[in-house]
C-alpha cells in the first residue's frame, strides 16, 4: 500500500504551474485590483484619505465606514474620480484555484472509472423509493414526513460494474443541493411519475442538467398507476428540451415502478450503455481530487463527511485541502460503515479528520506539501472573512429601512443548514426581513449563545437535541429557541415572525345590538341605561354607537357593565343589563345601542 501511495502523481505541480500572481497596487497611474476590498484597503493602496472617501460617499447619500467592502463598480468609480486608470486582474490563488485549475493526466495513466449518477425529480415522484430499492435498505420510513432531507451517496454493482448514486431531496428548499448534485454527476436519472407528469422540481432539475451540461436518462416511475398519461408526459418533457428516443431525440428512457421493484435492472442497463458512450476515465495513480457531498457532526467521532473521489485515489492518512481547511484523513469507510484503506475514482466514502464539517459542494484536493497547503488555506480563509464582512455590510446598507430579524441556524448536517439558510434569506415583507448571521452544524455552543445575545438573534435548530444546560442558559439570557425536524415548519415560523412586525391594520366589526328599556340616574356616575341585548354580545370597553329613530347621535365606549347589580365583562343575547356610556348622559328609552370591536385584518 505504501508503495502505491508514494508512486502517486502529486497535484502540487499542476497547481503551482497555473497559479497567477496579481498584486493590488497603483502603478504608473493605473490601479490594478483583483476583487472587492474595504475602503481602508483602497485608501492605503492609493495613498488617499479614507475619511475623505467616507465623507464623499456620505454626500452621495451612502452611509459607509472605512470597513465597508467596496463593490468592483465602486472601486472603478473611485478611480475615475481620482483620475486613475483601472484594470481588473485575474488572480489564481488559494481562494479560487480549485475552480480555475485543470489537472492533466497522460492517456496511458487513465483507466475506466465508476460513473456518478444523480437521481432527481419532483417531490413524492419516487426518487427515495427508487434509491431505496437500489440500496436494498429502507430510507423512506426513517426520514421526517417521508421526504428525503439529507443528500446521500451510495454504490451498487451491476453486471460486474460499479455505479455510484447521489440522491438529492425534492423539496424546493433543497434547490442548491440539487444544483450541486448536477455539477458533481456524470449522468442524471430524472424520475417522473407517470400519473403526475412534469412538475416544478422536474423543470428545475432539467435546468440544472442543462447548465451543468450533464446528460439525462428519464425513469418513468409509478407505471402501475391506472391514471397514467404517457403521451402527455413525453410531450411535457419535449416542451422542456428533453426529447426522448421514441420522439426522435437522444434521451434514453426506462419505465417501471420503484415500489414494485420493476424496471430497475433496465435502468441500470441504460446507465451502462450511456457510460460506454461517455467513456468515463480517471487516473488512480495521482493524489485525490473530488467533492464534498454532505457533512455532519457526530458527538463521539466529530465531523463525518461524505465525499466522492472524482480523480486519483484517496488513502487513509492523506492530507486534504478543502476550503480554508487542511486536514489529515483519520478514517475511511463506505456508505455502510465498513472500514476502507483506500477509495478509487468514482466512488463515495465517509471520512473523518476535519476539525469543522466542510461545506457541502466544496471541492477538495489531496496535497502532501503541508507548508504549501497551509498557504492556500490561509488565502481562502482571508477571502472568506472579506466575503463575510461584505455580506454583513451589504445587508445593513440594503435593509431599505426594514426591521432586520437576525437568525442563527444550527443543523445536524451541513447540506440541510445550507438549504434552510437559502430559504430563509428570501423571506421578507414590506416592513421586515430575515438575516441569517450564522449557519452551521452541531449542537448549540456557548459561542452561539454569545453571538445570539450580541446580535439579538433567534436560534433555530434542525434535528438536534438541546442540552438541559443550554436550555437553562437560553432562559437566563432571554434568547428565543425554536426547534423542528421538518424544514417547512421553520419556514412557516419565520413567516409568522415577519407578520408580527407588520404595522397592524384594524377594521370595526359589529359584535351585537341592544335597545334601552329603562333609565336610571346616579349623581356620582350619571345616566344608567337599562337595556336588553337583542343580538350578539356586549363587552366591557366595547365601542358603542347610539341611534335614536335611525339617526346616529353618539359614538363612545361602554364604561360600566352590570347584571343584577354585579359587575360583568360580557352579556349575551336575550339578557338584560345596565350600562353607563363614557362621557354621555343624554340616553333615552328606545335608543338603539350597536356594539363594535376593532379586529386586525392583516
UniProtKB/Swiss-Prot annotation:
Residues 121-128 are annotated as: G1. GTP binds at residues 121-128, 167-171, 221-224. Residues 112-281 form the tr-type G domain. CDD domains: IF2_eIF5B, IF2_mtIF2_II, mtIF2_IVc. The keyword GTP-binding applies. It is found in: Cytoplasm. PROSITE patterns: G_TR_2 (PS51722). Residues 221-224 are annotated as: G4. GO terms for molecular function: GTP binding; GTPase activity; translation initiation factor activity. It holds the Pfam family GTP_EFTU. It comes from the Bacteria. Residues 257-259 are annotated as: G5. Disulfide bonds: none annotated. Its main location: cytoplasm. One of the essential components for the initiation of protein synthesis. Protects formylmethionyl-tRNA from spontaneous hydrolysis and promotes its binding to the 30S ribosomal subunits. Also involved in the hydrolysis of GTP during the formation of the 70S ribosomal complex. Belongs to the TRAFAC class translation factor GTPase superfamily. Classic translation factor GTPase family. IF-2 subfamily. This is Translation initiation factor IF-2. The lineage of its organism: Bacteria, Bacillati, Mycoplasmatota, Mycoplasmoidales, Metamycoplasmataceae.
